[in-house]
């Protein structure tokens, strides 16, 4: 399914992210047991509408337009990857051009730390998907800025998981 450029804005940006899929209920995790609740990992393109992100103090508005994010296409079980999905390349290519080239080893918070923090706030349930943040190279930070437009092809790749490929289309009524 294509990602959609909304009618309200042309500033749809890509964000390659690691998706962490929860496999069992968890609350008040510790660094020692946090990864025990992880079923597996996938790819996520956290499509962001940059001008709407900047309309307030929270970025939520720019993260929740219909069909601007994408998830998948595979779920790789936690035991098939390095512990905590550590040391995996995370990349974005737009129309074949490499625009993001990061590594999970460079995340501000590793998977275990993210899960500990999240489980302090809420109960994690099977099927919950937590995304980890994006490497450097997003479109709005480039000079000049790059935004996805209809006809583009965006690939998010996480090493050991696969490639999430989306065509970009305009929102239809």
Model-derived segments and spans:
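Sequence-level detector for tyrosine residue identity
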Residues: 14, 41-44, 52, 140
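Short coil/turn connectors at secondary-structure junctions
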Residues: 8-9, 14-17, 36-39, 88, ...
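Generic structural signal for residues positioned in beta-strands
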Residues: 2, 19, 40-42, 70, ...
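Catalytic-pocket segment enriched in acidic/His residues
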Residues: 50-173
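Short Gly/aromatic-enriched secondary-structure transition segments
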Residues: 30-42
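A generic local secondary-structure boundary/capping motif
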Residues: 3-12, 18, 26-33, 60-63, ...
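Short, structured patches in soluble enzyme cores that scaffold and shape functional sites
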Residues: 7, 16-24, 42-47, 75, ...
């Amino acid at each position: 399914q294509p990602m959609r450029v909304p009618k309200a804005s042309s500033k749809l940006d890509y964000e390659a992210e690691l998706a962490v899929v929860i496999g069992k209920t968890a609350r008040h995790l510790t660094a020692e047991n946090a990864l025990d609740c992880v079923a597996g990992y996938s790819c996520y393109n956290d499509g962001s509408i940059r001008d709407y992100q900047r309309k307030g103090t929270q970025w939520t508005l720019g993260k929740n337009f219909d069909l601007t994010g994408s998830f998948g296409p595979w779920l790789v079980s936690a035991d098939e990857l390095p512990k905590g999905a550590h040391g995996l390349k995370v990349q974005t290519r737009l129309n074949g051009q490499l625009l993001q080239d990061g590594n999970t080893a460079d995340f501000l918070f590793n998977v275990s730390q993210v899960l500990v923090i999240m489980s302090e706030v809420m109960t994690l349930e099977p099927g919950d998907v937590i995304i980890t943040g994006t490497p450097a190279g997003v479109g709005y930070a480039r000079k000049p800025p790059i935004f996805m437009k209809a006809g583009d092809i965006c690939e998010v790749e996480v090493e050991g998981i696969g490639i999430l490929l989306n065509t970009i289309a305009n929102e239809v009524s």
